[in-house]
Amino acid sequence: EIPVFKKNVKRTKQFCKENNYHYKMWDLKDCEELVVEKYPEYICLWSEFRFDIQRCDFIRYLILHQYGGWYVDCDVYPTQNLDSLLGFDECFTTWSNDHKRKPYNAVMYSVAKNPLFIEIMKEVEKRVIEKQQIKQYDTWKGRLVFYTTGHHMLASIVPKSSIHELMLIYNEEKGIYISADNPYFYDENITSWWTDPQKKG
């Protein structure tokens, strides 16, 4: 177990308790049951993903479509009440120094059954079929993930009006300190799947 994940999950649970939000941690069994029972059209895609991180990305879109609510990565925790953000159909975050304002899928909100997430699922499927056949992506793990299930894929779908600066991102080891003016989330930006040199792209 990654210590930062354990620490920040505990903080998120406490935050939810204090703010009267329901908290759920999804395990692999939960995720696979959701695909089979609610999204059987994506069972083949689920098995076609080359990397587990693609499944981790994709399942969050299914969860938000099915149930709505907030998705928060394990290295992230909320820092202030989120009720003021609940007037949106969807809410995506971005790094405040990203001039292209690409949506960051570590933190996302949606109402249930939001058709935007159907578009996202279809775009993921299209890109996986296309890009996993390209030989260069055999060694470009990062690029494959970002362009099939990550922020580059989302940037082609999510309207700019749904993307907001809500994050404080701090990682001393990486030399990262980026903060919105009024951050709602603290992100330690662990990117645990990126540690193996073979995963670079």
Question: What feature does the model see in each segment?
Answer:
Residues 1-56, 72-201:
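Glycosyltransferase-associated regions of secretory-pathway enzymes
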Residues 57-69:
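Small-residue hinge/turn detector
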